[in-house]
């Protein structure tokens, strides 16, 4: 009798998997049309993509927080728009979503470089930050692992979020120090998860945004974030090349809002 019940159970599971597979194949792939600001206003919905971290976008039970989330939500409310914000850890997927029209803008601090300007239109700079090395603090007997400066990166493996703008800087460093730096791109984790992995000893080095690293360093008493990988750079939101009117609308609003007391309170909340 038990054997029959087992067969029935297995048969039911197999049938369920077949039904799910058939449904997934029959479900049409959602198509998106690239939009500019007038299209967004007509729809009443602003679609943004961001990175899930304590600075940009963070969900804690029923509350949503984050500098980029709160700032963009203020813009949306001022324009009577509903904000839809999607977290996406992969920079490449965020860029793909913008290009295909799935999202209207990337609302997380994105480094403004000559290369990134080839694919995105950037708002006026929102922040200044830089890429830093996350490593464990110097320990007796393990000093060989501690990096004092960029010249000591030769032969080391740096873990970086896949598609991160930090990759370009690391490749430049390879030329500058005339030595090999191994790069391990990670697509399933963000910078905060990489920090936890360094702290736990799973990896030795990661490259993260300084603002995110400083916001989380209090959680890890054994971490050091004092070695710079890049110089200070501008960070901004990015919109698609096909959305110049959206860019102008964002910039006009940001120019006014960043002078307000509300913005000063918001900035102080996330950047002390």
Where are these predicted regions, by residue range?
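Flexible hinge/capping segments at coil-to-helix
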Residues: 137-158
């Amino acid at each position: 009798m038990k054997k029959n019940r087992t067969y029935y159970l297995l048969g039911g599971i197999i049938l369920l998997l077949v039904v799910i597979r058939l449904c997934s194949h029959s479900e049409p792939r959602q198509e998106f049309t690239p939009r500019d600001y007038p299209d967004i206003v007509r729809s009443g919905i602003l679609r943004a993509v961001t990175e899930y971290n304590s600075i940009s976008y963070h969900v804690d039970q029923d509350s949503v927080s984050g500098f980029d989330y709160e700032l963009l939500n203020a813009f949306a409310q001022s324009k009577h728009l509903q904000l839809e914000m999607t977290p996406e850890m992969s920079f490449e997927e965020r860029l793909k979503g913008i290009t295909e029209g799935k999202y209207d803008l990337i609302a997380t601090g994105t480094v403004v470089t000559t290369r990134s300007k080839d694919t995105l239109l950037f708002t006026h700079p929102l922040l200044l930050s830089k890429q830093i090395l996350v490593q464990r603090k110097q320990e007796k007997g393990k000093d060989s692992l501690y990096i004092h400066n960029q010249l000591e990166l030769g032969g080391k493996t740096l873990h970086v979020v896949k598609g991160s703008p930090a990759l370009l800087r690391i490749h430049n460093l390879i030329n500058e120090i005339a030595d090999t730096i191994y790069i391990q791109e990670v697509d399933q984790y963000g910078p905060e998860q990489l920090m936890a992995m360094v702290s736990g000893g799973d990896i030795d080095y990661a490259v993260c945004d300084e603002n995110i690293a400083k916001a989380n360093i209090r959680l890890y008493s054994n971490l050091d974030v004092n070695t710079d990988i890049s110089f200070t750079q501008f960070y901004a939101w990015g919109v698609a090349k096909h959305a110049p009117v959206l860019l102008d609308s964002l910039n006009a609003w940001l120019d006014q809002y960043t002078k307000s007391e509300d913005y000063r309170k918001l900035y102080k909340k996330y950047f002390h």
